[in-house]
């Protein structure tokens, strides 16, 4: 009888284990919140917060708000699901910061672009060229910068393609493809 109970219990446990879905899955979206142990990701399916406590974050690139992200997990997609890996596009993290060049009018000054999280941008000391937003272009190192030019009398909206590069000394540059302007990323 005891042996029969043990067999029934073993079969029941095997059945429960077989029913749990531990196949690896991924959830891709945009980071809307992040902390030391969680990341909240939103896409068309909804918004979910994942535990990142034991996740591989070697490709997380700072988990910046607005960054495109892929979260790998197992089991059911639910609030608090444990992530096994979190990866973002490195171009997003490389882009965020102040990009400047010497100001040709003021030899002691600089001008440039401040690229911020969540797709926001601002001009630095450029009154007639106002950057407002940016987005990844989908190719490594490529961005689209958007704003308004007021230099010719009436405001004209613009979109520029820019390329991020890193030289052998680790210095990042941002080159505007339409005019060849080269900005250097400020150390922060």
How does the language model describe each region?
Residues 1-7:
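Bacterial N-terminal signal peptides that target proteins for export
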Residues 15-18:
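C-terminal motif of bacterial Sec signal peptides marking the signal peptidase cleavage site
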Residues 20-37:
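Structural detector for short beta-strands of small beta-barrel domains
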Residues 32-39, 43-46, 54-57, 105-111, ...:
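Contiguous, well-ordered beta-strand patches that form the walls/edges
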Residues 33-34, 72-79:
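Short, charged beta-turn/beta-strand-edge "cap" motif at the junction between a beta-strand
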Residues 57-72:
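Short nucleic-acid-contacting surface segments enriched for D/E, G, S/T with interspersed K/R
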Residues 79-93, 132-138, 175-188:
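Edge beta-strand at a domain terminus
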Residues 91-108:
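Tryptophan-anchored aromatic micro-motifs
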């Amino acid at each position: 009888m005891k042996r029969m109970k043990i067999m029934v219990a073993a079969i029941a446990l095997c059945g429960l284990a077989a029913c749990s879905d531990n196949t690896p899955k991924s959830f891709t979206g945009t980071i809307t919140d992040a902390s030391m142990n969680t990341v909240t990701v939103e896409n068309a399916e909804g918004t979910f917060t994942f535990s990142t406590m034991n996740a591989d974050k070697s490709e997380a690139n700072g988990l910046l708000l607005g960054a495109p992200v892929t979260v790998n997990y197992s089991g059911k997609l639910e609030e608090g699901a444990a992530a096994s890996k979190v990866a973002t596009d490195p171009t997003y993290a490389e882009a965020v910061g102040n990009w400047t060049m010497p100001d040709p009018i003021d030899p002691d000054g600089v001008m440039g672009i401040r690229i911020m999280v969540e797709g926001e941008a601002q001009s630095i000391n450029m009154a007639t060229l106002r950057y407002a937003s940016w987005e990844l272009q989908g190719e490594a190192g490529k961005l689209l910068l958007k704003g308004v030019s007021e230099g010719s009398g009436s405001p004209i909206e613009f979109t520029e393609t820019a390329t991020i590069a890193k030289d052998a000394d680790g210095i990042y540059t941002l080159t505007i493809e339409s005019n060849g302007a080269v900005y250097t990323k400020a150390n922060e």
